[in-house]
């Protein structure tokens, strides 16, 4: 099983009703020691920062063409705590309901679970805007996508 590092970030302008984007950087080193990288990003007309954080992780995992060991780095506690604190398991058990009502962004959580399924994923939180080079790079990809001209429609925004 190949080892991959996935760095992700999401951004939204005027959260929750403004444009947003995500950025992701995949890195892996092949058997010759050569580092390979792939950047992913997209922007949306109207979305939220949490949806873009999830989309960054989804895009990165969906870009993998075989099962991998993945270290996923995100500055989103919403994303990392859902897995590291076991929230996602409780949400699924309770049919996507919490004590305070339905879980938000069910469409993306379900898609993320499908994308994660063939891989072994470790979710790692990094402090945002604290000088971590790859987090900063993903932030730049996300904000550039949000500010771009070719914005997509986020069908899951209500």
Where are the regions a protein language model picked out?
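RNase H-like nuclease fold core
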Residues: 1-51, 55, 62-68, 140, ...
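RNase H catalytic domain
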Residues: 11-17, 58-137, 146
């Amino acid at each position: 099983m190949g080892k991959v590092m996935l760095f992700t970030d999401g951004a939204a302008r005027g959260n929750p009703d403004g444009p947003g984007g995500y950025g992701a950087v995949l890195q892996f080193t092949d058997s010759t020691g050569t580092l390979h990288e792939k950047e992913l990003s997209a922007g949306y007309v109207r979305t939220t920062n949490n949806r873009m954080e999830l989309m960054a992780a989804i895009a990165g995992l969906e870009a993998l063409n075989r099962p991998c060991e993945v270290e996923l780095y995100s500055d989103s506690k919403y994303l990392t705590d859902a897995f590291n604190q076991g929230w996602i398991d409780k949400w699924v058990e309770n049919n996507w309901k919490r004590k305070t009502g339905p879980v938000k962004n069910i469409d993306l959580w379900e898609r993320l679970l499908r994308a994660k399924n063939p891989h072994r994923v470790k979710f790692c939180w990094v402090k945002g805007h604290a000088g971590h080079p790859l987090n900063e790079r993903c932030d730049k990809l996300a904000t550039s996508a949000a500010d771009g001209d070719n914005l997509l429609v986020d069908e899951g925004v209500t």
